[in-house]
């Protein structure tokens, strides 16, 4: 099973070869732990959680069809993901909703504790900002990582990851805070000097009007120049969830 802990050899390669990496490649290396976490979330719930939900919440066939239209998944794949969602949502509180403690348990094997990195993952899934992740929000977020999701969807998602204050801009302090939190959770070692250099080069390249922050338009241009930033935002197995997680098909209790 994937552990979600990037190999420290990656950090060594970055520190010893930083001069040969482009700005985009360096910044991409910082992004890798976050996107790996989405992979860990799906695979860990699929393989390790063994609870059965008794929540009265159900998903009607009409809901499955609607979510299939709103995402890159087929109706059968949405149904399979509903089984995965139910496993995660009953791990602590069996109410058919994913609470932050349940997400933390899935990602870090510990239900409690404060972490900016976890907060950002949760906030990006929690579209309604009501403190829980509902199934349709779960589908919408995972759909961004589907191979058929558009480049613009992935670009927008990555922008929101670093726009901590939700001002419509990425500020240097936000990047510093977010990257530090990601590195802390991933055991990825980067020196302060190298991290500062990566952020300096990123803003020098992306902040075209030199106002100290990156707008959405500037971000779009930057990602277009450095497509490697989005390389890890695609999970190939989401193209066929029913094959990747066949047990969900046979365990489904979704009502037609």
Curated annotation (Swiss-Prot):
Positions marked as site (Involved in dimerization): 186
Modified residues (Phosphoserine): 247
Record note on disruption phenotype: No visible phenotype when grown under normal conditions but hypersensitivity to salt stress.
SUPFAM superfamilies: EF-hand
Tissues expressed in: Expressed in shoots, leaves, stems, flowers and siliques. Barely detected in roots.
Main location: membrane
Name of the gene encoding the protein in the UniProt record: CBL10
Residues annotated to bind Ca(2+): 207, 209, 211, 213, 218
Protein name: Calcineurin B-like protein 10
Keyword Calcium: yes
GO biological process, one term: calcium-mediated signaling
Cellular localization per UniProt: Vacuole membrane; Endosome; Cell membrane
Chain's role: Acts as a calcium sensor. CBL proteins interact with CIPK serine-threonine protein kinases. Binding of a CBL protein to the regulatory NAF domain of a CIPK protein lead to the activation of the kinase in a calcium-dependent manner. Mediates salt tolerance, but only when phosphorylated. Competes with CIPK23 for a direct binding to AKT1, negatively regulating its activity via a protein kinase-independent mechanism.
Record note on domains: The N-terminal 40 amino acids are necessary and sufficient for vacuolar and endosomal targeting.
Annotated effect of mutating residue 247 to A: Loss of phosphorylation. Loss of phosphorylation
Annotated Gene Ontology cellular component terms: cytoplasm; endosome; plant-type vacuole membrane; plasma membrane
